[in-house]
Design a protein with these regions (language model features):
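Acidic, metal/cofactor-coordinating or nucleic-acid-engaging core segments within structured domains
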Residues: 90-185
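Extended, charged low-complexity segments
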Residues: 163-229
Length: 229
């Protein structure tokens, strides 16, 4: 709605990182909430406001229930980070640079999430679960671990003008599959080298035609209704 757009415009320029107007921050939120099914505890904007004292590097904090998988109450507190860079390897490196910083501050991030939860409009059952999780009563603690949600966007490197619509879709799928395969081992090596092997990771990857330009152009269109003439 217009209220949301007004708030976005007050927070910063289209595509400005750390304001909630960054395409990566928004798509990270969508993937974690809609695809992973992890409700948001704090958005980037809320973190920027609440974490001024230590400068949060996190792009969002979400909570994922894994009770169905494990047959007992168990959660992942998912710290989010996003990176939109033309070169996929650089996008991965940028995301892991942020993860290293988040890891250093994970105690502060958790405390901030704990303090925020009470003002959230979760349903009563969810609020109670989160309270039990974050502030266990004596003798009762629900197990949870911290995990990372990572959104990456990069240049696909295909020119749509060279393909029919159907062929482009096919080429896109093949190229993306190849790109992800080529970088999977690199991502695994980063996780091991940085001593992050005890965390779960949720990766979401999106190819763009020109990542560096489009991350601003798309947000400009969203915030300014079709962009400037």
């Amino acid at each position: 709605g217009m209220d949301a757009l007004d708030i976005m415009k007050r927070n910063g320029n289209p595509g400005q990182k750390g304001t909630g107007n960054d395409l990566g921050e928004i798509l990270l939120y969508v993937f974690l909430e809609q695809v992973l099914g992890a409700p948001k505890i704090m958005s980037k904007v809320e973190l920027q406001t609440g974490a001024k004292q230590y400068g949060s590097k996190c792009d969002g904090i979400h909570l994922l229930s894994l009770e169905q998988e494990f047959g007992m109450p168990y959660y992942h507190m998912v710290f989010g980070t996003s990176s939109i860079v033309g070169d996929m390897k650089k996008a991965v490196d940028t995301a892991f640079d942020a993860i290293v910083e988040i890891e250093k501050q994970s105690t502060q991030e958790r405390t901030l999430a704990e303090n925020t939860v009470f003002s959230k409009s979760f349903d009563k059952d969810t609020v109670q679960k989160i309270k039990d999780l974050l502030i266990p009563s004596k003798g009762q603690s629900i197990p949870y671990d911290t995990a990372y949600g990572v959104f990456l966007a990069y240049n696909l490197g295909l020119n749509p003008a060279n393909y029919s619509a159907v062929d482009f879709r096919r080429a896109l799928t093949q190229k993306m599959d190849t790109d992800i395969r080529n970088h999977a081992a690199y991502i695994a090596s980063k996780i091991n080298a940085l001593g992050l092997g005890n965390h779960s990771f949720y990766f979401y990857i999106l190819p763009l035609n020109d990542a560096d330009a489009e991350k601003t152009q798309i947000m400009d269109r969203v915030m300014n209704g079709g962009g400037r003439p």
